[in-house]
Amino acid sequence: MPSLHADRSKPVVIDTNQMEWQASPAPGVWRKRLELVGDAEKGMVTSVVRFDPGCGFPAHDHPLGEEVLVLDGVFADEFGEYPAGTMTLLPTGSRHEPVTADGCTLFVKLCQYAGEDRPMRRTDTRNPDGWRQTYAGREVFDLFDEPGWPEKIRLSRLAPGTEVPHHVHEGGEEVFVVSGELADEHGRYRAGTWMRFPDGSSHRPWTESGCLLYVKTGHLGS
């Protein structure tokens, strides 16, 4: 498979609800790839992945790290079980063997968390103590914000009717709509939509219904 949306200087908006599931090398594991740079199976890739009940993926290393957000169901490996809302950060040098009993859907970023000195984290974002309010109508759950690394990763929860101030994406911004609907001056984005905004772009988002977002910033700079 050739590279897909590899030019990170260009904006991308993809509604994954309109995509067909593609088979992976593992039986019962399906994917919708959103961006790909390099080798089809070992390159840098962002995707939505679905595991059928009782299926798994062979044990594998993470030479450049992996990020996994459980969207629904229960994801598992030899270290534990991770229900919907769990965010796992696996740095360079980590290894696991994924499986699921009842099926699950994941948002996965492979080869985008490189560095042996990065922390390994498994965070249950259902924990109310992890959320903090930044302004009226917006709460965030910080998942990664460490000195020495350009990117920040968080979940952002917007209450119905919330307007986000106009802002410039210094270092770029990536958003996946986990639930609800987000809008800005360019369009409307329902659950399952993935967006990548390049360094220096800007927008003024809002939500009428409320929404939950995965947000990664600062990783798309030159």
Predicted regions and their residues:
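Short acidic-glycine-tyrosine-enriched beta hairpin
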Residues: A76-R95, D184-H203
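Acidic/His-leaning functional-site neighborhoods
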Residues: E139-T193, E208
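Small beta-barrel nucleic-acid-binding modules, principally OB-folds
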Residues: M44-P53, F57-H60, K152-A159, H167
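Short histidine-centered beta-strand/loop micro-motifs
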Residues: P58-H62, F79-G80, P98-V99, V164-H169, ...
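A short, N-terminal "cap"/entry segment at the start of jelly-roll beta-barrel domains
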Residues: M1-E41, G103, F107-K152
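Glycine- and acidic-residue-biased ligand/ion/polar-headgroup-sensing regions
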Residues: D52-C55, H62-D77, H169-E185, A191
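Ligand-binding loop in jelly-roll beta-barrel domains
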Residues: V29, E81, T92-D117, D199-S222
